[in-house]
Amino acid sequence: VDLYKAKGQEAIGTRYQRSKFRRPDYLHYSATGKAILAHLPAERVEWILDEYGLVERTDATITDPDALFDELEQIREQGYSVNREEEIEGIRAVGAPILTPSGDVLGSVSISGPAHRMRTPEYEEEMVAAITDTANRIQVDINTESADDEFPGFES
């Protein structure tokens, strides 16, 4: 479920955005989905794969469960996910999880753009920094709100 979407000045066309709402989304080929999968228990990920499979959207889509589990491990280690034209050819994305203090995943955020702009290591590093910073800010806001609930006598 998308809670919020925004388009930048150089956003990909509205036809692409509308088409995303007309078809099922699978977690294994999007940056947001992979960021979520990486932080779910392995049994839950296996259930999702058994239930929905690894649908191939492009030649770059991961369709092998072992390859997906390897990538999910890498995502946990590095703290972000990358969609390398796995959902739509010509579009790449970088995502980051939003976690509770105990490490449970609440959701994720991502930024996407044309592959020709997002292929350079410098640009990917810039996007990783932006998205992980955004995820961290959201986590702090959520965790601060939770802490306020634990101490109702204090007002912020």
Residue ranges of model-derived segments:
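Amphipathic alpha-helical effector-binding/dimerization core
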Residues: 1-50
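Conserved GNAT-family N-acetyltransferase fold
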Residues: 4, 96, 109
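Amphipathic alpha-helical segments that line or abut small-molecule/effector binding pockets
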Residues: 31-39, 69, 129, 133
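Short, basic/aromatic recognition patches
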Residues: 49-95, 133, 140-141
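Sensor-regulatory modules in signal-transduction proteins
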Residues: 98-101
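Glycine-rich acetyl-CoA-binding "A-motif" of GNAT/NAT acetyltransferases
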Residues: 105
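Juxtadomain coupling helices with adjacent low-complexity linkers
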Residues: 108-156
